């Protein structure tokens, strides 16, 4: 071998290898101390880019999980508040049910209504004060609120919480048909009851026979109420226009084909003769008689079949001749406030025909709290007992007054100049002649009895306090009447359904959020695992590398030492 001093090739090789080993040893120490395989872009440029993207995704998913939990917190807050509102509505319905029986007096019903008013105030208080981070939840403003629940923009879940104030819930549809005076066979169909389909009911006969009439139709409708959402009630009542005065029925006097015969009765039916005679056959006729609080004769069909008076009931009963054959009024209730669409054949036989005047109104929970408007009251069926009437079919007032049953025919004692005042018996009765259509009926000022230029013959003072031109009057608030209590029950039931629907929507969104959170939690774990695979160091493998480069570093130092020692052999040649 040659001996050279200027260039120590062995030492240079040993140094070069030692530099490489030292660099790798530094990297290994850096990885072992940081726990990361990639500490700089130089370690793995593409791997670093992927790992950084995965780290960003994992962090964003973590915040998305927090967003979802915030959303669940908001919805749970609203849900718990509505749970309290539902308890309030349950109490309102219970109190309305308590008021819906004639064992209650006006005083006790007024007390119940006061309780209901307070409950409604608390219901509205909950709706107006429930909030989360300053945002009102139950006021109707929490609509289409978005929550980011993904790693990329616009990956959101929307949540809406409906308004729960008493003015926004409980919207119930009431429709009551005209009073029926002619029977017949009826085919009744509900149109688009679920938004798509029609529901066709069995044919029903409207008559005075057992198993017929509005009662039979209401029963048929109510069988499917859970499916259609429409319930029916009926009122078949014939009421005298004035307090009973002494008189007598004719020999052929009959109700629903059952002969009762001649009965003499006193003022106010003081001897009970008229009521007793009618009630003696009530199991056969289905018609029950009573004297109301104003002393008027009231005939009621409990089963809902018609009331047909034949023969002569007597002038003292003051039965409107138009009411001698009466099949009542049908009332429909729907718990969503939408129109009740019907079709069929012979609908005029149930008061819902094309030419019939149908009273209809949609009423919210809050509206049931105050005085019930006359038109709303009529739609609810308040006027089913003939409290106000249009007397038609007579060419003149005198023709009506001389008709059978009017109480003003010859010998009645109510002739001109008799000095007898019977206006109180007709406070809510309107007589109209020569009026070809409803538009010819005019409202008049209080007490005037006439309207300017109407060219109508009118009698019995038309009082504005009586309500509208059909003789329907405003009714007192809420449960202070039996009909009102029934209506509040319907409205409270609708309100409960409304809140249940809102809560159900909230619940479905909560479930959606929870499933999403579970999913993105798993995704976050997998993303972090993928990042770890790329970025984190494998300590077992790196420990082996460290041992390798540590040994190489030591051996490199030894090799450099030996390479330098070899050069000293040249000195021996110079000795």
UniProtKB/Swiss-Prot annotation:
The keyword Secreted appears for this protein: yes
Pfam families: Flagellin_C, Flagellin_IN, Flagellin_N
Keyword set includes Secreted: yes
Main location, first listed in the record: secreted
Localization, UniProt: Secreted; Bacterial flagellum
A cellular-component GO term for this protein: extracellular region
Domain of life: Bacteria
GO molecular function, one term: structural molecule activity
Keywords of this entry: Bacterial flagellum, Secreted
Family: Belongs to the bacterial flagellin family.
Oligomeric and partner information: Heteromer of flaA and flaB.
Protein task: Flagellin is the subunit protein which polymerizes to form the filaments of bacterial flagella.
UniProt name for this protein: Flagellin B
Organism: Campylobacter jejuni
Gene this chain is encoded by: flaB
């Amino acid at each position: 071998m040659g001996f050279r001093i200027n260039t120590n090739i062995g030492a240079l090789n040993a140094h070069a290898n030692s530099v490489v080993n030292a660099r790798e040893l530094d990297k290994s120490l850096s990885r072992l101390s940081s726990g990361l395989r990639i500490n700089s872009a130089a370690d793995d440029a593409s791997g670093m880019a992927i790992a950084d993207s995965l780290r960003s995704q994992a962090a964003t998913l973590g915040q998305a999980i927090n967003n979802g939990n915030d959303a669940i917190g908001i919805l749970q807050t609203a849900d718990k508040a509505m749970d309290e509102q539902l308890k309030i509505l349950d109490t309102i319905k219970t109190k309305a049910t308590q008021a819906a029986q004639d064992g209650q007096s006006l005083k006790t019903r007024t007390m119940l209504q006061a309780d209901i008013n307070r409950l409604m105030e608390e219901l509205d208080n909950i709706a107006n004060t429930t909030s989360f981070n300053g945002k009102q939840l139950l006021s109707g403003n929490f609509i289409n609120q978005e929550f980011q629940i993904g790693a990329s923009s616009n990956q959101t879940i929307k949540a809406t919480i409906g308004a729960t104030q008493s003015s926004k819930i409980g919207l119930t549809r009431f429709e009551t048909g005209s009073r029926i005076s002619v029977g017949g066979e009826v085919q009744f169909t509900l149109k688009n009851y679920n938004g798509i389909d029609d529901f066709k009911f069995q044919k029903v006969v409207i008559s005075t026979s057992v198993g017929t009439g509005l009662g039979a139709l209401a029963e048929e409708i109510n069988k499917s109420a859970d499916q259609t959402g429409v319930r029916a009630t009926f009122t078949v009542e014939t009421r005298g226009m004035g307090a009973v005065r002494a008189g007598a029925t004719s020999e052929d006097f009959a109700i629903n084909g059952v002969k009762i015969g001649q009965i003499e009765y006193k003022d106010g039916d003081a001897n009970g003769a008229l009521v007793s005679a009618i009630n003696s056959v009530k199991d056969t006729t289905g018609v029950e008689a009573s004297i109301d609080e104003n002393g008027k004769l009231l005939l009621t069909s409990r089963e809902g079949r018609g009331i047909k008076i034949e023969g002569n009931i007597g002038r003292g009963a003051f039965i409107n001749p138009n009411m001698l054959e009466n099949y009542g009024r049908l009332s429909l209730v729907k718990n969503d406030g939408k129109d009740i669409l019907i079709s069929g054949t012979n609908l005029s036989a149930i008061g819902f025909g094309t030419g019939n005047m149908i009273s209809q109104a949609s009423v919210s929970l809050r509206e049931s709290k105050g005085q019930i408007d006359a038109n709303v009251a009529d739609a609810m069926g308040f006027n089913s007992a003939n409290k106000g009437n249009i007397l038609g079919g007579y060419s003149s007032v005198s023709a009506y007054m001389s008709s059978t049953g009017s109480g003003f025919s010859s010998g009645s004692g109510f002739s001109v100049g008799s000095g007898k005042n019977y206006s109180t018996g007709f406070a809510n009765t309107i007589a109209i002649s020569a009026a070809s259509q409803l538009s010819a009926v005019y409202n008049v000022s209080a007490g005037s009895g006439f309207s300017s230029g109407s060219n109508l013959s009118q009698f019995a003072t038309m009082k504005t306090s009586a309500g509208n031109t059909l003789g329907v009057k405003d009714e007192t608030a809420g449960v202070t009447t039996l009909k009102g209590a029934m209506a509040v029950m319907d409205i409270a039931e609708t309100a409960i359904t409304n809140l249940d629907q809102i809560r159900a929507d909230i619940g479905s969104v909560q479930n959606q959020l929870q499933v999403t959170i579970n999913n993105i939690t798993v995704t976050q774990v997998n993303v972090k695992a993928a990042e770890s695979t790329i970025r984190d160091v494998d300590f077992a493998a790196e420990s082996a590398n460290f041992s390798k480069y540590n040994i190489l570093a030591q051996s490199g130092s030894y090799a450099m030492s030996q390479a330098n020692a070899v050069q000293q052999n040249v000195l021996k040649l110079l000795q």
